[in-house]
Swiss-Prot record:
Gene, per the UniProt record: rpsB
Organism of provenance: Rhodopirellula baltica (strain DSM 10527 / NCIMB 13988 / SH1)
Identification of the protein by name: Small ribosomal subunit protein uS2
SS bond list: none
GO function terms (MF aspect): structural constituent of ribosome
The keyword Ribosomal protein is annotated on this UniProt entry: yes
NCBIfam families: rpsB_bact
Low complexity: compositionally biased ranges: 231-260
Length: 260
């Protein structure tokens, strides 16, 4: 099973990092080497991080926890939305609104407004307004739908948040840390892994890479939700500490770097 995942990761380019000039030194333990001024991630560390994250997300999902998936960059949005919907979890794929977590009550009230607008558009009520007002209401609806639609199922603060590229989503990470929400992230060579509870070192700019990681995590959530409450681990909501990187890089990583 692990060999199949490693093969899929290599095919998806999960091991490709950023240009060496953009690296964060704190990612050094997860880097195998460099090629053509591009850092190559140790695929074994990516596998370890992914399996650790899958186990944890499966456990918390089995315990009924909410997991918020966040990825607003162009390469991530579609996969984040698709896989979050598939596993029945809330998501943010367009824009992180300040206060999404720390001012959650306001976000819930805005969702109420979104539902009001939908009801207005679904019936004939909108025809009672002038053309100018209808246009204004439709613009308001489209903007709110784009930014808030993925949060409809988040009726409380999440216990866990998964982030694609925590460097870009630093505001989301900051809010999660402030509230004690466990963070899991796909993190590239230019980010700081010390800010994340469970880092998955990997390519966060490649569409295929993000799709592959999101699919694996969604599968884990679905599997966890299929368990009964009594089958869940007793301390499922306590995130395990990220294990120290292995001293020797994986053979698969060496092969991957030579293949380019």
């Amino acid at each position: 099973m692990a060999n199949e995942i490693v093969k899929e990761m290599i095919e998806a380019g999960v091991h490709f990092g950023h240009r060496t000039s953009l690296w964060n030194p704190k990612m050094a333990p997860y880097i195998f080497g460099k090629k053509n001024q591009i850092h190559i991630l140790d695929i074994r560390e990516t596998l370890r991080g992914l399996l650790r994250a899958k186990k944890y997300l499966s456990q918390v999902a089995a315990g009924g926890s909410l997991i918020l998936f966040v990825g607003t960059k162009r390469q991530a949005g579609e996969a984040v939305e698709e896989q979050s919907l598939r596993c029945g979890m809330p998501f943010v794929s367009e824009r992180w609104l300040g206060g999404t977590l720390t001012n959650f009550r306001t976000i819930r009230s805005r969702l109420g407004r979104l539902e009001e607008l939908e009801a207005l558009r679904a019936g004939d009520g909108i025809n009672d307004y002038s053309k100018k007002m209808q246009s204004s209401l439709n613009r308001e609806y489209r903007k709110m739908y784009r930014n808030l639609n993925g949060l409809r199922t988040m009726n409380r603060l999440p216990e866990v948040m998964f982030i694609v590229d925590p460097g870009k989503e630093r505001n989301a990470v900051r809010e999660a840390k402030r509230l004690g929400i466990t963070t899991v992230a796909l993190i590239d060579t230019d980010s700081d892994p010390s800010q994340i509870d469970l880092p998955i070192p990997g390519n966060d700019d490649g569409i295929r890479s993000v799709e592959m990681i999101m699919r694996e995590l969604a599968d884990a959530v679905i599997a966890g939700k299929g368990q009964t409450q009594t089958e869940a681990a007793p301390n499922a909501q306590a995130a395990p500490e990220a294990a120290a990187p292995a001293e020797q890089p994986a053979e698969e990583a060496a092969a991957a770097s030579s293949e380019g």
